[in-house]
Amino acid sequence: SGSTPTSTVSSPVRIVALSSSLTNARDIGQWLGCHSQATFNFAPNCRPLPLELFIQGFNLSHTASRLAAMVRPVYSAILRYGGKLRPRPALVFVPSRRQSRSTAVDMLTMAHADGQAKRFLHINPQEATFVKLLDAVQDQTLKETLACGVGFLHEGISKKDMLIVEQLFESGAVQVCIVPRSMCYQISISAYVVIIMDTQYYNGKYHVYEDYPIGDVLHMVGLANRPSVDEDAKCVLL
């Protein structure tokens, strides 16, 4: 019998693997007491599925105007990459809690204008389980958007409502879910296409708009990942 690598070293071997994206892997390694040769940082292309990233710029400095201009491209991206013959889930990240609610309403407004008010709903509205879950939703606006296939999350909704949204989204009944950037580490859902609507948030402490931390962007992009279901993934960065 040959010796294993762990039996030939003088100190115990410890492996710490992180599935979240980091911008300071070397600092984390030093904090854990590892020297640089024992810290491994994998490139973004080392992921279970190939990812196509699409970037669209907006030359508008006024935040509200820029977000308003992004509504139609977000809707179009859902239709284009979310699929028509084979609808696939779309996860949309927005800068704020208020924006998550308003964007959900905007998506339904555009669907209604296209004459397909429930194009994002992929379950029989009369299905007993679906009706029961909708009746349990406490937020009235959320209940109305879910009935048409669009859910949204933010820190203000109840834990029960959040679980219902995640359940309907993961089952495929609801195709679209809008989430504020601040919750990107809290959710447990993934999608075929991730759309990042703007890359700045308002810092209330200093009353300025700041760019998203690169770690947050990488984490949001990483949620376009369903290796057991899809063969590839898409991300749209606005």
For the regions a protein language model found, what residue spans apply to each?
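Short, conserved "post-DEAD/DEAH" coupling segment immediately C-terminal to helicase motif II
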Residues: S1-V13
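Loop/turn-to-beta-strand initiation segments
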Residues: S10-V16, R88-L91, G149, A173-V176, ...
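Conserved interdomain linker/interface between the two RecA-like ATPase lobes of SF2 helicase motors
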Residues: P12-A111, G151, E155
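Conserved segment of the helicase C-terminal RecA-like domain
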Residues: P12-R14, I189-L238
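A short beta-strand-to-loop transition that corresponds to the Sensor-1 phosphate-sensing loop
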Residues: L18-L22, V94-R97, V179-M183, D198-T199, ...
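Short regulatory helix/loop adjacent to the ATP-binding pocket of P-loop NTPases
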Residues: A25-S36, S182, I187-Y192, N225
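Conserved C-terminal RecA-like helicase domain
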Residues: V94, R98-V176, G204, Y209-G215
